[in-house]
């Protein structure tokens, strides 16, 4: 199935029920036509980071099901899988073989060997200045010692967690692995590959090792050359200043809109629509929009769309207005690597306020691109403090495990019923043609009018909203589709 211009659900294999069969059942029985695609967060055997330390891409974790379950989903929904191009688990065949056989291993060039990497740069490298220059996710050099079976030791590049060992994407053996893995994913139904942490994949002396140009384009192009003949696309994942996703988009790739979450929060906290209007006018059509994902709410992504003062205001309001949102939940004491993300569900970030939350999703639907909705957001979920405290993992505040019974109950809540109705309409409306147009006006400081029109100008959807009063009306071709006055109440 090709990528469709329909809302995409982001979910773990065991978060809507216990496994992939349950996910499929939830979609068919409880969600219906509100969702057209599914981003299945990593479902392979993994040794950490909730699937993001994959040990074996050839298998589905048996706890979730098997490839037949994945392929069954792919018959009804377009699918996105994650490929962690930057790293792989210590339990992978590659690492274990290297550990056992050292320089006799076929995988001796699969990983980035720290000492060998710096030896090419000259004597006495790395210096402290070299290490300080690296864009790091921890407060020390990004290395991990490996002890080989022959008793010797050396350091491997290790950007993220202890289980996630960096791959040398320029080595022949890694290129072969990347090609066979991606081809296998498409064979099992992937229409879109999310390249996780790709900006860290290229390492180069005398750079910060993050989004290293021009080499990063070579890496992306190599992946595209593998996928294009298979009619699959790439979605590179990067949390950074909006100018970098713009560059990626200019190269013809899908991108994420990670600026929208914070910009929308600012709009609904302040009641002012000017910055949202500015961003909607700037945004590309070939993108997937988000308000929430499996990670926290990105702050850095909105820089220069919002001023520093506006970002500070929105961040502080998030802690004031948000329900059960505390600064400590996004700190090192809750195992957070990224200080530029705030951990909360989007619903709780808006104070569990149904009107504000539904309006945030209305803004997302009218934004350029295809909307992605995280499973907790689809069910307007509140912060899961019990899971957070039992695991001391900050991001788990937004990773509730729903039983089938919970899902059936949650979809009956008015806010969820209205969201599902909104998405179902969006999926079928021709006005949201990605080849079409968007116009944005702000008649007053607190109001915004967004018009989406298809390429041939035959279909038009108009949103009129007041961010201060949290009211809105959607009109399609002269007919009111939904408004604050005609919502499902019970």
From Swiss-Prot:
Keyword set, alphabetical order: Glycosyltransferase, Transferase
The reaction(s) this protein catalyses: sucrose + phosphate = D-fructose + alpha-D-glucose 1-phosphate
InterPro entries from the UniProt entry: Glyco_hydro_13_cat_dom, Glycoside_hydrolase_SF, O16G_dom_2, Sucrose_GGa_phosphorylase-rel, Sucrose_phospho
Enzyme Commission number(s): 2.4.1.7
Taxonomic source organism: Leuconostoc mesenteroides
NCBIfam families found in the cross-reference section: sucrose_gtfA
Active site: 196, 237
Superkingdom of this protein's organism: Bacteria
Protein name from the UniProt record: Sucrose phosphorylase
Family: Belongs to the glycosyl hydrolase 13 family. Sucrose phosphorylase subfamily.
Record has Transferase as a keyword: yes
Annotated residues for binding of sucrose: 49, 87, 194-196, 237, 294-295, 338-341, 395
Subunit details: Monomer.
GO-annotated molecular function: sucrose phosphorylase activity
Enzyme class: transferase
GO biological process assignments: carbohydrate metabolic process
Pfam families, per the entry: Alpha-amylase
